[in-house]
Design a protein with these regions (language model features):
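Hydrophobic transmembrane signal anchors and adjacent membrane-proximal interface regions, especially
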Residues: 7-9, 35, 50, 149-151
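Phenylalanine-focused residue identity feature
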Residues: 18, 34, 85, 108, ...
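Short acidic/His/Gly/Ser-rich catalytic and metal-binding motifs that mark active-site loops
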Residues: 17-27, 67-70, 140-143
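Donor-binding and catalytic core of enzymes assembling or modifying cell-surface/extracellular glycoconjugates
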Residues: 26-122, 129-132
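A nucleotide-sugar donor-handling region in carbohydrate enzymes
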Residues: 1-19
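Leloir-type glycosyltransferase catalytic cores
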Residues: 1-3, 128-169
Length: 169
């Protein structure tokens, strides 16, 4: 199933359950396919594609409704664990976020690059991986919705401490 003409690079841009932020006035979900606490910034993801697309067949792993990238094979439908694990096993490179795929790669002993924004590799990561951690915010931030982790995963935009991508990495 995973045979391609070039070696496979997996680019996981979003992951985990996505609970949309609710508009407090209407009670309706805000249409925003990006969760700043977990998702790889779009600019970084596209620059990875631009750099590696000549040498690799890039498969973007994202959730339904996640942002799209130019020049990738997009996987945004639910796959079985066997399908996901086999894709990890046959891939040549993996650029991931803190999600199940980085744990799978570690279980297979496959060094990967993992982006960390709202979580920490000290808690959830592996020394095997090349862990890229977001910079700490320069200003104090009221984390009113966060009680389990430094930041909640449900896209609390009111907690986002970064004004631009340059502030993050």
């Amino acid at each position: 199933k995973w045979v391609r003409e070039k070696p496979i690079l997996i680019l996981q841009t979003t992951g985990g359950p996505f609970i949309p932020q609710m508009n407090p006035q209407t009670g309706q979900p805000i249409d925003n396919p990006y969760a700043w606490t977990r998702d790889m910034p779009i600019e970084i993801a596209q620059s990875v594609v631009d750099k590696y697309s000549k040498d690799y067949h890039i498969i973007q792993i994202t959730r339904q409704g996640g942002y799209g990238l130019q020049g990738v094979e997009r996987m945004d439908t639910q796959m079985s664990n066997i399908e996901l694990f086999s894709l990890i096993a046959v891939s040549k490179k993996r650029i991931l976020i803190d999600s199940a795929l980085q744990h799978t790669a570690a279980a297979f002993g496959l060094k990967s690059t993992v982006f960390w924004i709202g979580t920490s590799p000290k808690v959830f990561g592996y020394k095997l991986h090349n862990n890229i951690v977001a910079k700490l915010p320069k200003k104090a931030n009221q984390l009113i919705n966060s009680y389990t982790f430094d930041f909640q995963f449900d896209n609390n935009i009111n907690e986002c401490p970064y004004m631009s991508i340059n502030d993050m990495f």
